[in-house]
């Protein structure tokens, strides 16, 4: 049985910087967040597909085509906001209930980081929120959301994204929502293999060992039976 696949899309890229306010450049913020999301998911029984892993151009049309071709289990489109507001919001296609459920989980994880909630919002045709990556859910049936964690031009929000550690936490929030939505299990941890072919913790007969205490001299060869 194939593993669930999560498509992670960092918004903008290349010659499209997205929202910019001083040192806060959306394309860079989204990439760091997306990579952190992928890294967290490496611990779970799933596959990830990245729209981009470097600062390259990545159009909405390209991402929609990739989703259509690869048929992932869900889509996480990562963005940051601008325009003077404050807080986080998550968009979903207004007629797609599974996407709404995913949006609720993503928003809940964002709020756990201490961010102000602006709620989940509908993406629909005929509005300025007609997002392609949300819209494709209606044709593919794949749960898809577009998240906006913070406003790059708001001082309070800037304080929540001003370090790699904080961006990593945002990426992990997206990942945790995906884990919850898909019911993913952690990968089994393989026990470490002992070096030299022996059993872990075993001492070969005739080995020279150091023993603390008065009974044996340090470095003395012991006869082990």
Predicted regions and their residues:
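Short, solvent-exposed loop/turn elements at domain surfaces
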Residues: 16-19, 155, 217-221
């Amino acid at each position: 049985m194939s593993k669930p696949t999560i498509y992670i899309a960092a918004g903008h890229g290349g010659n499209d910087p997205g929202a910019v306010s001083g040192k806060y450049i959306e394309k860079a913020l989204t990439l760091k967040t997306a990579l952190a999301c992928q890294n967290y998911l490496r611990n779970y029984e799933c596959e990830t597909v990245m729209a981009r892993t470097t600062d390259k151009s990545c159009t909405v049309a390209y991402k929609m085509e990739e989703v259509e071709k690869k048929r992932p289990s869900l889509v996480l489109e990562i963005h940051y906001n601008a325009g003077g507001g404050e807080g986080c919001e998550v968009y979903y296609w207004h007629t797609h209930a599974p996407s709404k459920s995913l949006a609720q989980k993503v928003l809940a994880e964002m709020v756990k980081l201490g961010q102000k909630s602006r709620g989940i919002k509908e993406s629909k045709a005929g509005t300025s929120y007609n997002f392609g990556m949300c819209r494709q859910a209606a044709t593919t049936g794949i749960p898809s959301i577009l998240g906006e964690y913070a406003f790059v031009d708001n001082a309070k929000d800037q304080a929540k994204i001003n370090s790699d550690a904080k961006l990593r936490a945002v990426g992990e929030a997206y990942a945790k929502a995906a884990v919850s939505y898909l019911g993913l299990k952690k990968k089994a941890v393989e026990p470490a293999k002992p070096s030299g072919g022996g059993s872990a913790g075993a001492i070969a007969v005739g080995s020279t060992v150091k023993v603390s205490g008065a009974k044996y001299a340090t470095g003395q060869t012991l006869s082990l039976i």
